[in-house]
Amino acid sequence: MSMTDNVADMLTRIRNAYKSKLINVSFPSSKIKTSILDVLQKEGYIKDYVTTQKNNISYAEVALKYSVNGDASICEIHRVSKPGKRVYSAIKALKGYYNNMGIYILSTPYGVMSDREAHIKNVGGEVICKVF
């Protein structure tokens, strides 16, 4: 069975791993997925990730981040732009997610970045997902 939305699959695996209190989660890797993981790591939502090769397929293994009392660093992670309905936004139209406590991850002409970085560079793009 082929997958139509690989990014949504990655986000679902991360969400389910946090709900199950897992330490690590792995899934097939791609350029867009590693770009999203870079943003999540830079913003402090995950500890680290490593890409490995097994049987000519690259996998990403993500080390999830929890607080001292065991709370997940990601409460919500949702896909915004889907294959059937792409969502594009100018940076001025994006308001802060959860009063600037969460982030939007955008795919811009300058690469994948958070809405905070996009505000600094004054560039909009496709809204991939939102994280809180």
Curated annotation (Swiss-Prot):
One of its GO terms (cellular component) is ribosome. GO terms for molecular function: rRNA binding; structural constituent of ribosome. Keywords: Ribonucleoprotein, Ribosomal protein, RNA-binding, rRNA-binding. Gene3D superfamilies: 3.30.1370.30, 3.30.1490.10. It holds the Pfam family Ribosomal_S8. InterPro entries: Ribosomal_uS8, Ribosomal_uS8_CS, Ribosomal_uS8_sf. Disulfide bonds: none annotated. The keyword Oxidoreductase does not apply. One of its GO terms (biological process) is translation. Belongs to the universal ribosomal protein uS8 family. One of the primary rRNA binding proteins, it binds directly to 16S rRNA central domain where it helps coordinate assembly of the platform of the 30S subunit. Part of the 30S ribosomal subunit. Contacts proteins S5 and S12. NCBIfam families: PRK00136.1. This is Small ribosomal subunit protein uS8. It comes from Rickettsia akari (strain Hartford).
